[in-house]
From Swiss-Prot:
One of its GO terms (cellular component) is plasma membrane. One of its GO terms (biological process) is amino acid export across plasma membrane. The lineage of its organism: Bacteria, Pseudomonadati, Pseudomonadota, Gammaproteobacteria, Enterobacterales. Its main location: membrane. It is a multi-pass membrane protein. Pfam families: AlaE (PF06610). This is L-alanine exporter AlaE. Keywords: Amino-acid transport, Cell inner membrane, Cell membrane, Membrane, Plasmid, Transmembrane, Transmembrane helix, Transport. InterPro entries: Ala_export_AlaE. It comes from the Bacteria. It is found in: Cell inner membrane.
């Protein structure tokens, strides 16, 4: 059975396409796992202790949060990687850019989640400000955690350029 050049090229092209799709799936899974694990924990602390939400409201917020983290995790990873290109190797620069990425992307989403879950007035303001402060401090730890999870999945840490642009 002889293969034509076109058939061989088509097979190689399909193989490369399948590998890119598999890598994108792995990137999506790694970023989603990292976001859900890290921010479910920190969200509970903020909602209960700072926003003063009831346990029922916290549960509702975490369920909504988990559902929203699935479609948001990979776009956030791409956003973070894009912003981290601006950071230089110094700790201060890494801290600044990781924190800026997290606050600018996640705080508006978080405010909507807790508002929809029942936080109003002062509780909504305190919860949103609390989340913003937490994210300022957690930006770099989350960035390091995200890089660690990506490494566990066999992916590069990101930050040089968005992983989705590697292929």
């Amino acid at each position: 059975m002889a293969l034509s050049w076109q058939s061989l090229i088509d097979r190689i092209t399909n193989l490369a396409k399948n590998q890119r799709q598999k890598k994108r799936g792995t990137e999506f899974l790694a970023d989603t796992v990292a976001l859900i694990l890290f921010f479910t924990t920190t969200g509970i602390i903020n909602e209960r202790m700072i926003a003063g939400m009831s346990w029922d409201q916290v549960l509702h917020a975490r369920l909504i949060g988990a559902a929203l983290m699935i479609p948001v995790a990979r776009p956030y990873g791409i956003w973070r990687d894009w912003l981290m290109q601006r950071a230089n190797p110094s700790r201060g620069s890494q801290l600044l850019w990781d924190s800026m990425a997290l606050v600018s992307f996640q705080v508006p989403i978080y405010a909507a989640i807790i508002a929809f879950s029942g936080a109003t007035g002062g509780g909504l303001v305190r919860g949103t400000l609390g989340a913003a402060l937490m994210m300022l401090f957690l930006g770099r730890p989350y960035g390091a955690f995200l890089n660690w999870v990506r490494k566990l999945f066999g992916l590069p840490p990101g930050g040089d350029k968005p992983m989705s642009l590697d292929s």
